[in-house]
Regions:
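Structural signature of the two symmetry-related core transmembrane helices
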Residues: 72-86, 279-293
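Helix-loop-helix hairpin linking two adjacent transmembrane segments in secondary transporters
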Residues: 128, 135-182
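Extracytoplasmic gate region of multi-pass secondary transporters
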Residues: 26, 214-255
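Paired small-residue
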Residues: 96-104, 302-310
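A late C-terminal transmembrane helix in Major Facilitator Superfamily
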Residues: 329-365
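Extracytoplasmic
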Residues: 7, 13-37, 231-236
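Cytoplasmic helix-loop-helix junction between adjacent transmembrane helices
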Residues: 103-140
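Helix-to-loop junctions at the C-terminal end of transmembrane segments
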Residues: 58-70, 265-277
């Protein structure tokens, strides 16, 4: 049973790796513009519409995952993305067809990101439960880095369609998901095998009451996402145009290193929480904010490298940490709702960042560098507020008596 449970956890994490397949378009946007000259304002939807679909799919998952089998939702989502990507690769379609198929690639980013944390919380052994949710985020980040790398390699032909050969990587993953993804909605013994019976019973006893600390964490995530995404939306413009510290090649290297840093932080977030306890998210928010100050303060390439890597590392500590706390503080249908909202809020943060951050930055002179710097300062303020949400959450999850001793 232990071996089977381990295989189930591994396959769930493998499907997490596949969630952000939509990101292929971001690395070949220039080729897309070349393929549709004079239609740039419409062609950009190939890379932006999937994020909107991802956000909508995540919010819809709060309902879908309550009434549908979670394994089926994951399988169907992956199958849709494979078919959509294959159509872009193999069929000579007009622009509207490519936009529609690209949009469908955003579905797994919403549904898988919502379903997998709730499944992991059920099937993972108790001693791994506070780790696997961080691994889930880490695998999604690793998947994004892999898809962008392969998309760029396949796109060397000059045809953006060839980048979608990357989608073929999902076929063996889908086969493994069909065979070994834990069917927690059908086989209730999986929850008991993982020690989850107690949580299930607690969920029933609570009568569906949604914990207030979960509301607080979702709000923290929303406000945080608006401002931590300022780095990703401004760093290339700052490096290439505003500060003129390097070319797009330098920006690309920094982006890749950021992905590596984010992958590492997802793997170590459980140890971070155990070491810093109720201060875990406060410190991560503040250090993420401090890192975002480095490019503007140093006006150097080294400052951009250090700022980007540290920003992404602590950003993913926050993302994985809040995911972990939320997954451990909610059970049953509340957990499904919480994770769906969390995935949707991430997309909302990206969307709102594009409108709110420039307005705030303009109050202090404007520009990409100022947008990043002001956002960093705001993240530090959010970090202070985070303490008042995480302190009771940490006590709820780890126990009041052990808050200052457990895992010390």
């Amino acid at each position: 049973m232990i071996k089977h449970r381990g295989l189930g956890v591994a396959v769930v994490l493998l499907s997490s790796f596949a969630a952000w397949i939509y990101c292929i378009a971001t690395v070949v946007l220039g080729l897309i513009y070349q393929a549709y000259p004079g239609q740039e304002n419409v062609a950009i939807l190939i890379s932006t519409l999937p994020t909107i679909v991802m956000m909508l799919a995540a919010f819809a998952s709060s309902v879908i995952l309550r009434v549908c089998n979670r394994k089926l939702v994951v399988v169907v989502s992956m199958a849709i993305s494979i078919v959509a990507g294959a159509l872009i690769l193999l069929v000579d379609m007009p622009l509207v067809g490519v936009i529609a198929c690209s949009a469908l690639l955003g579905i797994p980013g919403g549904t898988i990101a919502s379903a997998n944390p709730t499944v992991l919380a059920i099937v993972a052994p108790l001693n791994l439960r506070d780790k696997v949710l961080g691994w889930h985020n880490s695998l999604m980040m690793l998947g994004m880095a892999t898809f962008q790398l392969l998309g760029g390699v396949f796109g060397e032909t000059g045809r953006f369609q060839d980048s979608y050969k990357t989608v073929l990587l999902l076929i063996p993953i889908l086969v493994l998901v069909i065979l070994f993804y834990p069917n927690v909605d059908k086989d209730r013994s999986l929850a008991q095998a993982a020690g989850g019976a107690q949580e299930t019973a607690a969920a029933s006893a609570e009568g569906g009451k949604f914990p207030m600390v979960a509301v607080g964490m979702l709000l923290l995530y929303l406000f945080g996402a608006i401002f931590w995404n300022a780095w990703f939306m401004n760093y290339s413009d700052y490096i290439v145009n505003e500060a003129q510290l390097g070319t797009t090649a330098m920006a690309g290297v920094i982006g890749s290193l950021c992905s590596v840093a984010g992958t590492v932080s997802g793997l170590v977030v459980a140890f971070w929480i155990k070491a810093t306890k109720r201060f875990s998210m406060t410190l991560a928010f503040i250090l993420c904010g401090v890192a975002m100050l480095l490019p503007q303060l140093t006006q150097s390439a080294a400052g951009c490298y250090a700022g980007g890597i540290l920003c992404q590392f602590f950003n993913l500590i926050v993302v994985s940490g809040l995911t972990t706390y939320l997954g451990l503080a909610t059970t049953g249908k509340n957990a499904t709702t919480a994770m769906s909202l969390l995935a949707g809020i991430e997309g909302s943060g990206v969307f709102l960042c594009g409108y709110i951050v420039p307005v705030v930055g303009n109050l202090f002179g404007g520009g990409a560098g100022m947008n990043i710097m002001v956002s960093g300062i705001i993240l530090m303020v959010i970090g202070v507020a985070a303490y008042f949400v995480i302190k009771p959450t940490h006590e709820m999850v780890y126990g009041k008596k052990n808050t200052d001793q457990q895992h010390g």
